[in-house]
Design a protein with these regions (language model features):
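Electrostatic cytochrome c docking/interface patches
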Residues: 41-65, 77-84, 109, 179-182
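The canonical Cys-X-X-Cys-His
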Residues: 60, 66-75, 125, 192-196
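Electron-transfer interface patches adjacent to heme c in soluble/periplasmic c-type cytochromes
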Residues: 18-28, 85-189
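Post-cleavage N-terminal segment of exported redox proteins
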Residues: 1-53, 167-172, 193-201
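Short, solvent-exposed loop/turn and secondary-structure capping segments
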Residues: 30-38, 74-76, 81-86, 140-141
Length: 201
């Protein structure tokens, strides 16, 4: 034991050697953290039926993120019996390949939304967003009444699609060119409802 301590003592007394050994250990730890991410990025393919968001749903996802919905709602069903019985099959990475930023979340004040699409009607979703306590008296969710009058900007949606295409999402020129027409006359409320209704489908 005393012999082993001499090596530690020698390293501790030599600041240059200690610094080099620290850099080596940090580099090894960094490789252990980063390498799987680089491999996984190429290995995770979209699940069957998973496509990039259309223009209206993409605008809705942006509203969802901007309004901080992810702070109270997750979109990740864990592989626990209680969760799969309540929400359905557990979430897998291939369902979220087009989510930037990802929406898995880390906290639930409200229910998980990964499979909410189609569970309620569009009218229910609209009312719930405008006046949550009208449909769920015990809800502590805030009302989002301003979304009903906020019009979407088709040029912003098209620019977002171009950016996502640069990041690897398979948007075509016709998708991008048609974005303005797809959201013409639509509100942020319409977009958020469309986004929610598509989750899990």
């Amino acid at each position: 034991m005393a012999g082993g301590y001499k090596y530690f003592e020698a390293v501790e007394k030599n600041a240059g050697l200690l610094g080099i050994l620290i850099l080596i250990m940090v580099a090894m730890g960094g490789l252990a953290e980063i390498t799987p991410l680089l491999i996984q990025a190429h290995a995770v393919k979209p699940a069957p039926g998973v496509k990039p968001y259309d223009a209206l749903r993409l605008a809705g996802k942006d509203v969802y993120v901007r309004e901080g919905c992810y702070l109270c709602h997750s979109q990740m069903i864990r592989a626990l019996r209680a969760e799969t019985q309540r929400y359905g099959a557990h979430s897998v990475a291939s369902e979220s390949v087009y989510d930037r930023p990802f929406q898995w979340g880390s906290k639930r004040t409200g229910p998980d939304l990964a499979r909410i699409g189609g569970k309620y009607s569009d009218a229910w979703q609209r009312l719930h967003l405008l006046d949550p306590r009208a449909v769920m008296p015990e809800s502590n969710m805030p009302a989002y009444r301003w979304l009903e009058s906020a019009k979407l900007d088709g040029n912003d949606v098209a620019a977002r699609m171009r950016t996502l295409r640069t990041l690897g999402d398979p948007y075509t020129d016709s998708d991008i060119d048609g974005a303005a027409k797809a959201v013409a006359g639509k509100t942020e409320l319409d977009a958020l409802v469309a986004y929610l209704q598509g989750l899990g489908k």
